[in-house]
A protein has these predicted regions:
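Positively charged, polar, low-complexity stretches
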Residues: 2-88
Length: 88
């Protein structure tokens, strides 16, 4: 089980990316999915947070192929974009 400090660190890093668009995409993805992640998924997400926002957004939109180490269920879930909250 992850420590509270580890989850808070991931939450902060997911929601403070540098642009509002990346904050919504990456932060929204974290909020919607982190509760179901095991240790491997948390480590993969933490590694993904080291990547450039423009790359993560391109993977989510399907305009660029992610590195092989990120391919799989997490990227497929990222591509769904159903976790982004849009203000009305």
């Amino acid at each position: 089980m992850p420590s509270d400090a580890d989850l808070k660190r991931l939450h902060w890093r997911a929601h403070h990316r540098g642009t509002k668009e990346a904050d919504l995409l990456v932060g929204g993805f974290f909020d919607s999915h982190h509760a179901s992640w095991g240790e491997v998924e948390r480590a993969t997400f933490a590694e993904m947070l080291e990547e450039q926002d423009v790359d993560i957004m391109a993977w989510a939109h399907g305009t660029a192929q992610p590195p092989e180490r990120f391919e799989g269920p997490m990227i497929e879930a990222l591509k769904q974009l159903d976790y982004i909250r849009i203000s009305r």
